[in-house]
Amino acid sequence: MASNVEAPEPWYLALLGFAEHFRTSSPPKIRLCVHCLQAVFQFEPPQRIEARTHLQLGSVLYHHTKNIELAKDHLEKAWYIAQQVPQFEDVKFEAASILSEIFCQQNLVDSAKPLLRKAIQISQQTPYWHCRLLFQLAQLHTLEKDLVSACDLLGVGAEYARVVGSEYTRALFTLSKGMLMLMEKKLSEVHPLLTLCGTIVENWQGNPIQKESLRVFFLILQVTHYLDAGQVKSVKPCLKQLQQCIQTISTLHDDEILPNNPADLFHWLPKEHMCVLVYLVTVMHSMQAGYLEKAQKYTDKALMQLEKLKMLDSSPILSTFQVILLEHIIMCRLVTGHKATALQEISQVCQLCQQSPRLFTNHAAQLHTLLGLYCISVNCMDNAEAQFTTALQLTSHQELWTFIVTNLASVYIREGNRHQEFSQFKHSK
């Protein structure tokens, strides 16, 4: 509660204490926690307590139960009531943030966007929430593959962070924008942006872990930029710096970061995730450079690390890392003739994608492509053709499309359908 508000009633503190006790029990007693919070409304509390309780109920129901509709109802009430209460930013914007997550989960993106836009509009005097909501809306546009709108929002965020004196968060916004520009293959525009990022990162003096994490983000983008441009030899110095950064971060204490500027209250990735990501880009470089044994060695290390992390951490990004690593190592196995192992790993990718609709949508074309390559390796040309044809229908990625067409062409040549089938490519893209 804010200091300028009267002390809360004893009944409220008692119910809140019980609710928190049940929530943090092992195992959590969510039903009892919810009952305690619902009991608050029996006392007809003032608006501040009413709004906060609706937020707490919505958050508990969203994170710990499947009753999403009831969670949404409480969060909508929290958002509505909190807008009528002065100086109640945390409740107001947290309600908007979680509510927009639920809308996205329910594919109600057209409800999430205006909610986030309004929250962004009225949060300009609250730097932490303004930046967080900008990141959230940019992420929503990215998931919709509207990278232009996402880049615009990240640009707005970078300028806002500069104005409020947060060079750290300005760097995060700018690096995020650079990442999206790499996704769009805007290589000529990425170079000056990365140069700016490098300057901001090197000049920023602050928490050592935050500084090293910015440096890792920057170097990851540099490596990706060089690999996209086919400049494999230019990657080595960046990889060496990345490995040094990870070693430095691992020696730093993970104390809670409490910066003076509230706009600095962000962190890119946990250091354990960064470690896996460095393994991943090392594997990508090794594959492009033709160092297949090295690629296998780093993939094995990364997958072992991922298995340990996933026992304690349910973050979706870990499954994404795992799928990308497996996609690379499967290519390695097929090139080196380890077909049975490749098939087992393709099965692992299938299982991971089945657990996440978004992962399946993003990797279905790659999965069918890998199956097609496996079919070629065991001389099942009809099956290879079917897999590649399906993959073509699922991808809008130009480089993957070219790779699939090249392999499909090799299938047609082996089958003797060269002239008849090549004509189809003219109309397929």
Language model features: what each stretch is:
Residues M1-L61, T65-N67, L147:
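N-terminal alpha-helical scaffolding segments that mark the starts
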Residues A7-P8, K29, P45-R48, K66, ...:
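Short coil/turn linker motifs that delimit alpha-helical repeat modules in TPR/alpha-solenoid proteins
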Residues P27, H64-T65, Q106, L137, ...:
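Structural motif corresponding to the intra-repeat A-B loop/turn of tetratricopeptide repeats
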Residues L37-F43, E76-Q84, R117-Q124, G155-V163, ...:
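Amphipathic alpha-helical segments of tetratricopeptide repeats
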